[in-house]
Amino acid sequence: MDKEKKLLSRKLAKVRGWIQAVATLLTNIHIPNLFKGKIYQGNAKTVCVPGLNCYSCPAATGACPIGAFQAVVGSSRFKFSYYITGFFILLGVTLGRFICGFLCPFGWFQDLLHKIPGKKLSTAKLKPLRYLKYVILIVFVILLPMLVTNSIGMGDPFFCKYICPQGVLEGAIPLSIGNAAIRSALGKLFSFKCMILIAVIVLSILFYRPFCKWICPLGAIYSLFNKVSLLKITVDSSKCVGCGQCSKACKMDVDVCKTPDHPECIRCGACIKACPKDAICYRFMGKSCQKNDNR
């Protein structure tokens, strides 16, 4: 076992919260805009950020990849976007759902909510709901923006408009506080989206990351690359004693020993910290935490 790699893996897992905080700050660097009710519209807004972060957030540094993708497929001049597709492939192949675990602002928001003291419920018996996010990806992110269009052939960003709670949290609420015109224009759709946000908040206190597990289309996209991503979690079979502590620690309901590269794994490192034999670590570009592993 490579002790240095194991030590680095444990350190990375331990400082995950700080990395999430820094990632959220960098993703929303224009903080003064929160008090002005204005959206930053500089050149950086043409670049997508890796996690789910609303374009309409006054502090947002860049564009939301899901919002950008819907803008492309819903355009009357729709054509295959090499930029957006390449963005998903590059990040997916490189990091997979590590982005969900370390770099996504809304993922961190759910983590903080789940730390609120109180009774916590398991999602182990709700595994079929995992597939809902793929349905949402196909229907609300791809098909509806393409097929349901207005008189000039433009489709709505259906996921952003009707489902995404991050848009309300980061966009509508801050903008309405700082902008009287926007505040006066709020209607039933805003109320409906607020109900979704409240539901996600309550569920996040009870369950671990319900939005990530069941709803998020961005997580659905990144999950498709988990088995082939360069960054993975690997188990040293020569050290593993089958105690099951890693799977008990996994809040994403993954059997770590059997499927460490499962689509639901967000690379949070909980299993690394829980392993009493230091048999689990991060692996990048095929370099395993097992000395004699030549994969």
Placement of each model-derived feature along the sequence:
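Non-ligating segments of multi-cofactor redox enzymes
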Residues: 1-257, 263-295
